[in-house]
């Protein structure tokens, strides 16, 4: 196909399409289509496309071909932009305005909702329950039909009426000397000068302040900064059955004054006067009664009115006061404080490793060491645990004499007395008191997140957790996984008739929302799971379930690979969910590579033919069957079976029969596993979603190896040990995170080739004459860069109510460098020209410079010859970023003792990209290295040398190894879902 052109007549005849290079037009009722004309966003080649409305439409193509440019950057962006444009300028100021995509016309657009993987909540307060709004309904349920209990003795409590309280008082011994009090101030700071006048006018004469009774006209002077208790004396009487009416009236009045709370003092003092007396615990017995919830055994443990906000860990009424509702606390970790191999004098205490030998801090610690008999000149590992504890936590109020030679506030030669606070209390105090973000982040290097010791991760106050429904509190419900929650909700929960009327509609909504989560393959997730620990695929499917629950119609949904992280077994549920969304009369537009999803689509659009500048065209559009029969479509060839990823002819055996063995893995849902990873081969860890793959590989294996081999400050999940680490010298985790967070990062800087290019330019005659060094050719520092745009090539202009506009720098015209730097040339090209070259062009240009050409060739080999050397890192897809990382590893000299860990490397990759990726990974393993891959893609699984399959289910029903062996051995195993699906791929 030349320049994307096709025989128009043939296309019209075969498909009813008009497609000269980038057109797919359908002749039907125009109201039934989203009509796109002249789309040129990013790499799109002026394409025309008709997308049927109210259908499940899949857009596919190679990584970087322009799928997201069409689906998200054009269709969704324009739908969102039109909605926001319709709002007032004031509203637009808060919402922000999206740039208008580059196209001629788009008609037939509906309101658009994007469900991608990038908008996952990073808020530590967000959980699966809050994101899906299930928690809102649980809070309402507990507030309306929850049964409160005493948080101390756990007995059920209920409200008391005035009559109940009076009857209880009348049961006291006849002749008891009683004083009835109404609390009006409880543990509050202030002078409370208004109380005397306010209550004298109402006819009261006495008040008890901090346990002492005063006449109201002799109200004491109170300390403003201290907390006080003040109770109004409502009545005094000696208990007699004949006083029932008076006592009842007084109690009713006291309850009104005390806002539902009263105190009854049973006075043991026989004197007639009470003014000025301290009526405290020594001579009185205090009885507390409440119209609110209160325990008869522990009346001081008052339970507030049950309302929804009480059950929120984001509200002060319900949140645990220690962790403020987070369930965790940042605490200094002693293991991160010490460098066990160094002495204190050499900097063995990491937070203070830069202090001078004559510093106040070190001299004070030397005084501590002298008193407790240890030296600051021996390695920390040789100190006793008691001595380390002294260093970490201090020595209390003990004082030490420290002689200082200094200036400023310290007099030279003077001796000062000081306590030694300890490393951890010092860091905690500074972290709390500092206003400097830099200092706070610096201290946080030595902190780790630990479970809150007050609420033990429950996030709520004890009084809230004491409210139950059928024996379960709200945290117990949230600790259930979705499947278990559905099991409980499907039972007939017993309520009174009145409670059932309230609970039934709430339970119905909860049941529906939880069922939608199960339908998208998330049955293993616990509702209390923090949202910031979810993978992109999990977060996307949660949002998908939430959208289904909304029941909207006539909406355009745009999804980005919802099948990511989903086992083939759960894929059918996801497809059924997408169809359900479509059946609600919505248009569902999905960017996807999964073959089952493509074959289930109503309409399929194939973008290509290649990636980057060589992509951006509609190669084929139609039903999946039509695409499969189109010889021009690369996707069609894989769908029809005309093209396949070959099965390896042989499977590698472990190198020298060596293994990396994880012993006693118990983190999260792992069931005390011992797992052997063979060295020198490609191992795939497979299994249903939530079975424990990421916990085993990422949280235990990767974190432990990074800490042991690279001294990274990573914390491995709970396990006993890992054997065989001595057979490795490096552990490299290759994920799909960006290669840089700013537009200044690019492939040239990430791979390190830009250093060699700058050094090459510095050796050119013109550069040597002018005395230019390599730094002159950096756009990040002063010297060679354009100072007008500071090396960006563009200037940002703020437009307030309109989107920010980026205009080409008028000084350098987008070249990033000043005139002097651009006057230095190599083979007729300046440094800016080189950055604008594609990798393919650069390989040819630098063919005689091996230090540059060899690194560039590895990028070319991973299929990224189309990207530009200076292309911004923020423009790359996850698949492209990962392949740049793999190329960087390929260009390094292999030791044959490296472990590579990849987590779902096929994310965002077309089947043809997967084929290319497997060849690259095979090269890394062929050098004697070890590869461990977490993957659901059956093409990768069938290409492995060894498979570790986990299950049998997700969540608490997972965490076990259910099968190990070669792909052929796994395929014969009927007990594993992976094996059942793998059989078809091995035929």
Question: Language-model segments: which ranges?
Answer:
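Conserved phosphate-binding elements of NTP-dependent enzyme cores
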Residues: 1-987
